[in-house]
Amino acid sequence: MELVLTMGSRIKIDGTYNQNTITMLEELKINDFSFDLRPKSFNFIQEHVLLDILKAIYRPWNRYYLHFENEKEYVIEKILHDVQELVVKSGNSTDLVENIFLEFSDGLALHYYESFKTPYLFHLDERHRLEDLKAGKYLRSINFSYSYLHHLQQSGKLGEFVGGFLKQLKRMEPPLKMELMLSMDWNDDPFFSLFHYFQFNVISFPLNQKVELSYRNIDYELLKKYVKGKL
């Protein structure tokens, strides 16, 4: 089935690496941008480039995600501190920066993510225990990859998984104001029952070869076409 966003849902762009792309996407009312700080990623962005981008076009109404995977704790803390300091010095935010999020895809325990005392999202898969969700004081979003949910559906385990997930959410006290996020590729064809199980607040799409003319050379017309087709 063709994916079209429901009312209230947002698009998030993963692997953002230049100002021009962000500016173009902002014109399409996209306000969620993830920066890939995983050194082995094709979309890896160095800290100084990230800081230059935010210094030039930081918007207090946007949401910015710093994506890490199996990174050293002190590296995460330094980059987070530098980003928050830049935002505060820009005069566009108070000391409490609420639109900078950590993003993790390494399958570690939630208490590790909680140790940064910063709003975060994590990519949920078979490495996590659903009962650990109750530890999520700073947890703001859970990301499901479409490939993982499709695997559960194909193996006949999706219904059981959803039941366990919703059961754990109901046990959380106090209830968290938490978003559900679905990450998928531009040409993924989601199975119909997926949206009976979940109401996603955010759908994330990557900057990859499907929207590039060559490596890190965005085909802006094609990207616009894809994004407009989801809105």
Which positions does each model-derived feature cover?
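Extreme N-terminal starter segment of soluble prokaryotic enzymes
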Residues: T6-K12
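Catalytic beta/alpha-barrel core
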Residues: K12-D14, S34-F42, W61-G164, M178-M184, ...
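Conserved, mostly hydrophobic/aromatic
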Residues: L25, I203
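C-terminal helical cap(s) of enzyme catalytic domains, especially alpha/beta-barrels
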Residues: E47-I57, N208-L231
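A short, acidic, amphipathic alpha-helical segment used as a generic capping/interface helix at domain edges
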Residues: F161-R171, W186-H196
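Residues lining hydrophobic/aromatic ligand-binding pockets adjacent to catalytic sites
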Residues: H196, F200, Y215
